[in-house]
A protein has these predicted regions:
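Membrane-interface transmembrane helices that cradle and orient dolichyl/undecaprenyl
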Residues: 133, 168-180
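Transmembrane-helix motifs of polytopic, lipid-linked glycan transferases
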Residues: 116-133
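Start-transfer (signal-anchor) and selected internal transmembrane alpha helices
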Residues: 1-45
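Transmembrane-helix signature of polytopic, membrane-embedded enzymes
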Residues: 32, 129-148
């Protein structure tokens, strides 16, 4: 609870600092100030989500156990799981286990995986907020709504769903750009 308030206060203070600079810089620097605020907010959310203890959230510990189990799976087991899920209709989350296995090629540290998931979730969110707002205050209000409507809790407890949400933010951007070839990648991965 206190961490959410700290994030909101830090972002508010940074926004006020940027507004003071904006008055001195002029209109050209305003877009850069918006981008800086969006990046700052995104980094805070990544840190909040990625550096949490495994005891935070009811599912984080179970996700950690699942992560360690699936890092030990062979690629053949991952392939068989895909076939079981998508052809036989048995099991679930084949895309998530594939993501875990791919990630385990680089690191088997669960905390690093949580930071990676934070990046996958919050970079698209930050980009979405930046592209769909016009003022510094809009970015802060978006962060305020995110924190107060318990979506920050969702990103801590539902890792698979949070990853899917990150892909949805990317998909919205692709739809707006009418780039359907990029849209098929996130929707077919079924994370």
């Amino acid at each position: 609870m206190y961490l959410k308030v700290i994030i909101l206060v830090l972002t508010l203070l940074y926004m006020l600092f940027l507004k003071l600079q904006y008055k001195q810089i002029g209109t050209i620097g305003y877009d850069k100030a918006r981008k800086n605020l969006a990046i700052f907010s995104t980094l805070l959310l990544i840190l909040q989500s990625g550096l949490r203890h495994v005891g935070v959230g009811p599912d984080t510990y179970q996700y950690m156990l699942s992560f360690h189990e699936h890092t030990l799976w062979t690629w053949q087991q991952i392939l068989h799981n895909f076939i079981d899920v998508y052809q036989a209709g048995e099991g679930k989350d084949a895309g998530y286990y594939l993501l875990v296995k791919l990630f385990s090629e680089f690191s088997t540290d669960y905390q690093v995986f949580l930071v990676f998931v934070g990046i996958v979730v919050f970079v698209p969110l930050g980009r979405f907020v930046y592209k769909n707002t016009e003022r510094l205050e809009d970015i802060w209000v978006a962060l305020l709504l995110y924190q107060t409507l318990f979506y920050s809790f969702f990103s801590v407890t539902g890792i698979r769903q949070a990853i899917a949400t990150g892909f949805c933010f990317l998909s919205v951007e692709c739809i707006k750009a009418v780039s359907y070839t990029h849209l098929t990648l996130p929707t077919t991965s079924r994370v």
